[in-house]
Amino acid sequence: MILASQSPRRIELMREAGFDTRVIPANIDETALPDEGPFDLVERLARAKAAAVAKEHAKEGEPVVAADTIVALDGELLGKPADEADARRMLHALSGKTHQVATGVCIVRDGSAESFVDITDVTFYELTHDEIDAYVATGEPMDKAGAYGIQGQYGRMLVEKIDGDFYNVVGLPIAKVVRALSRT
């Protein structure tokens, strides 16, 4: 099996689920199309990643799993922060609010593809300026969409509740992926 991602969290989830995966990241243009909604974007990107890697690297019968995760607050995409100031801006925006984490997943095997989008609602506690500054100072938010990692030592303390799949917020709804793999 090929995992078309270099995300350490996705690699770990696939290996913990018992899959022996080759890691081959896709190199595609991830720019959103004009008027493309966040959920359409993640599904399109997952499909493009899976197709690109399958075309170049997959052996006969070998599945390719690709995923793309975004954080959206009131329709605004929150990607990985550009710098610490950007991380603070995102965390202030998320403070006390519910946002969505969406992961698009695509599995390609022998030319056929199955894709889906999983959406989880995440609600943050009200965060103080000091809490945000302290969290940003850990460095933990800097490589994560929305400037937080729910699985992180500190990021987990920001989240009041979730409605949906915890592992989707981590970066891969692994139970749904396993079920989809059994169908393809």
Which residue stretches match the model-derived regions?
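Short glycine-rich, Thr/Ser-proximal phosphate-binding strand/loop in the N-terminal lobe
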Residues: 18-36, 113-119
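Cofactor-binding loop segments of dinucleotide-utilizing enzymes, especially the Rossmann-like FAD-
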Residues: 6, 26, 110
